[in-house]
Amino acid sequence: MNHNKSYRKLGRRADHRKAMLKNMTISLIKAERIETTVTRAKELRKFAERMITFGKKNTLASRRNAFAFLRDEEVVAKIFNEIAPKYAERNGGYTRIIKTSVRKGDSAEMAIIELV
């Protein structure tokens, strides 16, 4: 049974999953648009939106929380200086998932996740 599961396992161990989602969050913030599978995009959305919300708070504690997860000062600076001010008036929903096609090798559903 799958009751009360608040995240997808993505077929990986916890440390691998966390590292993958961290790297995908960094890629999304840098490029503002990446292509991945639908389930990864849905899981990535949670982390990306949390980082942008930290940026909107713009406190020392929120900057440290963002850095504790991302471990990349350049990306944290981009969140706080460029991305968060764009979403000052928006309450959540900073990302958009657009389903595209299926991957040729394994027919996995692909999607583009981008910042709105």
Curated annotation (Swiss-Prot):
GO terms for cellular component: cytosolic large ribosomal subunit. One of its GO terms (biological process) is translation. Keywords: Ribonucleoprotein, Ribosomal protein. The keyword Nucleus does not apply. GO terms for molecular function: structural constituent of ribosome. Pfam families: Ribosomal_L17 (PF01196). Disulfide bonds: none annotated. The keyword Ribonucleoprotein applies. NCBIfam families: L17. Part of the 50S ribosomal subunit. Contacts protein L32. Belongs to the bacterial ribosomal protein bL17 family. This is Large ribosomal subunit protein bL17. The lineage of its organism: Bacteria, Fusobacteriati, Fusobacteriota, Fusobacteriia, Fusobacteriales.
